[in-house]
């Protein structure tokens, strides 16, 4: 404990001051020479867009333009022009329809759709953000993929908004993919594909690894998104054609 009445003691010198040879001071010329020797041989030329690659590219990932893939930048701009949120759509009629117009079987189907889509869009978001985007070696592709991650999270918000608006049991709905065999089977297939490309030691310069990555990409784009998602949308659009759950259907139309 410090006692402020104690007499001042002499200050001891630091070890480096006692042994100057162990901590030499370089003069200005010596410092410049040492820095020049340590500096790597850096190519400071601007990026040539022809050298960019979708994956396994060696160009500077921090230089956005000039573009090699201008369509990706256009997709990014168009996606930002088409901004919306689930709160933009009136769900009042859906609350009435769910409580008074849907049969027990129709409610069951509606809930199963939400259960499958909530889990699936989280998987889609993780696939793009964790498995695909970080492997893209052209920045315009990464930027568009980043927007896609946001879109998938927006879709998940949509389903959550429907669940909250209708007052459904969130724990039961979100856990249903573990209980319903048909839903669980699809999720397990997607999980296996995703896990195979999330490994820390994946090497896309290896032909077999690259083939597996492409197969996972095709699966998520063509089957998971292209087929299974639309199978999930179709029961909601069938209800819409009968004048039911039109708010939910309008939400889903923003995804398509």
Located regions from the model:
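Non-heme di-metal
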Residues: 93-256
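Generic surface-pattern signal
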Residues: 13, 63, 78-85, 164, ...
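Short, isolated positions within intrinsically disordered regulatory regions of eukaryotic proteins
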Residues: 8, 75-77, 88, 161, ...
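Short acidic (Asp/Glu) and glycine-rich catalytic loops that position anionic groups and cofactors
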Residues: 36, 51-55, 243-247
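Membrane-interacting alpha-helical segments
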Residues: 25-43, 87, 100, 104-110
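N-terminal intrinsically disordered, low-complexity tails
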Residues: 1, 5-36
